[in-house]
């Protein structure tokens, strides 16, 4: 099988869709797997993703040429390190304009770098419309549609909601109980380390609920990762 490198683009055209949470969970998943990821945060102001992983995530302002070079050139490096981009909703349009104008996706494919788009959806009509537009512009790009119940409100059945999007790959992040969420220091708490070595000074109820929530997410990441490996046989 031909080796490949992976770039994960986590994005949404709207705020409060769970982009940073999803990027964080994916980073923690790779840490749990023993594969430290390299991250990029395109929000130059609050930079929540970079603040969470100061030694792994670089802040890039893609409204500037310098920021664009810093991000996109580094994404075209072929190695075994997964790269994760947290696309700020205000950078969303600019990010995809650059992809289109530079032929970035085609260059990445030439270098055996697979772009995996994790599209964080919500129930606003523009969310589905934008996903379909991206799918039409880059039909060969892998798209995973994510529903994060802790960030966006879903009145409809989540499975039915996800089925409307132009991909059969999906990710469902359940809402974490508020009491459990308040029990951990999100800025310094490592989900990967928690799964490896659960703290015994944590409430057994909180520990059980958090583990169940994480296992549900990480199992989906594992399934999606295996699916990508299977799909790689197309490029032999």
Region locations from a protein language model:
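Switch II (G3) loop of P-loop NTPases
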Residues: 81-99
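Inter-motif core of Ras-like GTPase G domains
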Residues: 96-123
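Loop/turn-to-beta-strand initiation segments
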Residues: 79-84, 114-116
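Short beta-strand-centered segment that lines the nucleotide-binding/catalytic pocket of NTP-utilizing
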Residues: 33-48
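Beta-strand-loop-alpha "switch" segments that mediate conformational coupling across diverse proteins
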Residues: 149-217
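P-loop NTPase switch/communication element
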Residues: 45-61
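Glycine-rich phosphate-binding P-loop
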Residues: 9-26
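Extreme N-terminal, non-catalytic leader segments
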Residues: 1-9, 73
């Amino acid at each position: 099988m031909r080796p490949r490198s992976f770039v994960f683009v986590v994005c949404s055209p709207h705020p409060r869709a769970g982009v940073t949470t999803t990027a964080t969970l994916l980073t923690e998943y790779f840490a749990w797997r023993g594969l430290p990821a390299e991250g990029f945060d395109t929000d130059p102001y609050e930079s929540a993703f970079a603040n969470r992983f100061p030694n792994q995530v670089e802040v890039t302002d893609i409204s500037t040429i310098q920021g664009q070079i810093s991000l996109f050139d580094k994404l075209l490096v072929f190695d075994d390190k997964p790269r994760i981009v947290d696309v700020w909703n205000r950078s969303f349009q600019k990010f995809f304009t650059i992809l289109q104008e530079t032929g970035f996706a085609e260059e990445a494919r030439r270098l055996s770098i697979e772009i995996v788009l994790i599209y964080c959806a919500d129930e606003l009509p523009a969310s589905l419309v934008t996903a379909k537009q991206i799918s039409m512009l880059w039909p060969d790009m892998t798209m995973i549609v994510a529903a994060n119940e802790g960030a966006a409100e879903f009145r409809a059945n989540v499975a039915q909601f996800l089925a409307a999007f132009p991909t059969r790959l999906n990710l469902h992040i359940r809402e974490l109980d508020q009491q459990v969420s308040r029990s951990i220091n999100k800025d310094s708490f490592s989900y990967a380390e928690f799964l490896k070595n659960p703290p015994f000074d944590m409430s057994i109820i909180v520990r059980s609920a958090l583990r169940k929530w994480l296992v549900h997410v990480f199992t989906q990441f594992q399934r999606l990762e295996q699916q990508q490996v299977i799909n790689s046989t197309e490029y032999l």
